[in-house]
A protein has these predicted regions:
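N-terminal secretory signal peptides that target proteins for export/translocation
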Residues: 1-3
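Sec-dependent N-terminal signal peptides
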Residues: 5-17
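Ubiquitin-like/PB1-type beta-grasp interaction modules and other compact soluble beta-rich domains
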Residues: 7, 19-261
Length: 261
């Protein structure tokens, strides 16, 4: 009897290990990625999407479409692969005379040289689909600079492709100018415009300790298409306790100085 119980115990352990291995093998067949879809003037989707291994960016978009009722897509098949034409009624080639506007994408901050139907995703990839006209109207990809945030200054640069006198393409770090900054503080937001050099001066009263959401927007005058890639809805910067105290005293000093100006 003891031998039978011992054999049954060993068998149960083996079965449990086998089932655990099967579950792990099943989970390994799935990958989870982050997907953000930026329309013309707002974010249309932002969240994690789980798809089977060896899936493409297009598969990720299809999965998001199936899971999210507010998201609709139109995909057209061609000799060059499947092409994403329309997301939520924003149809490629309808906003500019030259019809160069359309949907583009980046993975981990890099624009792949293949279409969405050819790029194979990996776990933890960060995918951003966005609408614009990068080749004609232009598009910048802002990198935030907070080195002088304690002084109330914030600015953005972008690594842009420019052309020299011989029309050779070169990359160059350029200042982002002419945008509108939306700064979050204490559950509220304030819009701030930069100077001609692209530097925003944030009043000290908005430099409270803790996290502050940051959004940047800029649109072409003729087409209203975005010319900067917006940040994710939850993008933020944090002001430390020390910097918050410094900003508070600078605000007091500024107020006293203005009384004697």
């Amino acid at each position: 009897m003891k031998m039978f119980k011992k054999s049954m115990s060993i068998l149960l352990v083996i079965m449990m290990l086998a089932s655990s291995f099967a579950l792990c093998s099943f989970a390994a067949d799935d990958v989870t990625v982050s997907l953000r879809i930026e329309g013309i003037d707002k974010c249309l989707f932002y969240g994690d999407v789980t798809v089977a291994a060896d899936s493409t960016v297009l598969d990720v978009i299809k999965a998001a479409d199936e899971a999210e009722e507010s998201l609709t897509t139109t995909i057209v098949d061609s000799d060059y692969g499947s092409y994403l034409v329309d997301i939520n009624g924003i149809v490629a080639g309808t906003y500019t005379d030259m019809m160069w506007d359309g949907w583009s994408y980046m993975v981990d901050g890099v624009a792949p040289d293949v279409g969405v139907s050819a790029y194979r995703v990996e776990s933890d990839d960060v995918i951003v689909m966005y609408y614009g006209d990068p080749w004609n109207t232009g598009m910048q990809y802002p990198i935030i600079n907070t080195e002088k945030l304690v002084d109330g200054e914030i600015s953005f640069t972008s690594i842009d492709t420019v052309y020299d006198e011989n029309w050779n393409a070169v990359t160059k770090e350029c200042a982002v100018t002419g945008y509108v900054l939306t700064w979050g503080y204490n559950g509220k937001t304030v819009e701030i415009t930069p100077d001609e050099n692209g530097v925003c001066k944030i009043p000290y009263k908005y430099l409270t300790m803790g996290k502050h959401t940051v959004q940047i927007e800029k649109y072409a005058a003729k087409t209203d298409l975005p010319t900067v890639l917006r940040y994710a809805p939850d993008f933020s910067v944090e002001i430390s306790f020390f910097d918050g105290i410094m900003a508070f005293f600078k605000m007091i000093f500024e107020a006293i100085t203005s009384l004697f100006a």
